[in-house]
Amino acid sequence: MKKTQTWIITCIYLQLLLFNPLVRTQGICRNRVTDDVKDVTKLVANLPKDYKITLKYVPGMDVLPSHCWISEMVEQLSVSLTDLLDKFSNISEGLSNYSIIDKLVKIVDDLVECMEEHSFENVKKSSKSPEPRLFTPEKFFGIFNRSIDAFKDLEMVAPKTSECVISSTLTPEKDSRVSVTKPFMLPPVAASSLRNDSSSSNRKASDSIEDSSLQWAAVALPAFFSLVIGFAFGALYWKKKQPNLTRTVENIQINEEDNEISMLQEKEREFQEV
């Protein structure tokens, strides 16, 4: 019986190990992002609208894949948030500006550490350092939120291109979160991709989705088949052991009956002797 229990426990651990790769595909740094990022809205409301925050904006956020800029962008966000933290006094109130910024700094620092552990080999950084720019709180934390969203889905998947060049001549795209100070000077890869029509872009997007689905299937199918095989072996093992267990129970019952008969015979002999 103990051997059967040990075998069942072994099967459970085996299935956990088989499904472990599925957990790893959900974003390499996803667990570093806490619910404290939701306080960004409160922080933006507390800061003056015309307040300026210095940030060395990493070009390429709007034209290159996230793995091309996320590592350097999070480092610059850490520097800017730390500098912003130093400008506020340490207030004990739970939702004070200092408290919120301090939590955001910890999140960003954890992301920096995570990216150091999971570096992308195909990213070739620009030789020029990003130039510092001034952003309003709304635009600055718009960049922050965009970087956090990129981390939630970031996976260690090798990009198709051999390298992605981050050009220092690129500037933020003009939208509700980021302003433009200079025209775009796109790197060769990005420029050639933007020359394609909308149908080509849609095809690339669909190809990306298909590639992601294939990568997921490549991990899920082996784990699924391993799970089925594991349960099949478990069923065979149980069927093999079941007759043995039945015979063991029958033998025990027979031995008990024999013992009772022997005891009765012995008592009968003792009674006859008396």
UniProtKB/Swiss-Prot annotation:
InterPro entries: 4_helix_cytokine-like_core (IPR009079), SCF (IPR003452). Ligand for the receptor-type protein-tyrosine kinase KIT. Plays an essential role in the regulation of cell survival and proliferation, hematopoiesis, stem cell maintenance, gametogenesis, mast cell development, migration and function, and in melanogenesis. KITLG/SCF binding can activate several signaling pathways. Promotes phosphorylation of PIK3R1, the regulatory subunit of phosphatidylinositol 3-kinase, and subsequent activation of the kinase AKT1. KITLG/SCF and KIT also transmit signals via GRB2 and activation of RAS, RAF1 and the MAP kinases MAPK1/ERK2 and/or MAPK3/ERK1. It is found in: Cytoplasm; Cytoplasm, Cytoskeleton; Cell membrane; Cell projection, Lamellipodium. The modification Pyrrolidone carboxylic acid is found at residue 26. Disulfide bonds join 29-114, 68-164. It is a single-pass type I membrane protein. GO terms for molecular function: cytokine activity; growth factor activity; stem cell factor receptor binding. Residues 239-274 are cytoplasmic. The gene is KITLG. Glycans are attached at residues 90, 97, 145, 196. The chain crosses the membrane at residues 216-238. Keywords: Cell adhesion, Cell membrane, Cell projection, Cytoplasm, Cytoskeleton, Disulfide bond, Glycoprotein, Growth factor, Membrane, Pyrrolidone carboxylic acid, Secreted, Signal, Transmembrane, Transmembrane helix. GO terms for biological process: cell adhesion; positive regulation of cell population proliferation. Homodimer, non-covalently linked. Heterotetramer with KIT, binding two KIT molecules; thereby mediates KIT dimerization and subsequent activation by autophosphorylation. Residues 1-25 form the signal peptide. A soluble form is produced by proteolytic processing of the extracellular domain. It comes from the Eukaryota. Belongs to the SCF family. PANTHER family: KIT LIGAND (PTHR11574:SF0). Residues 26-215 are extracellular. This is Kit ligand. One of its GO terms (cellular component) is cytoskeleton.
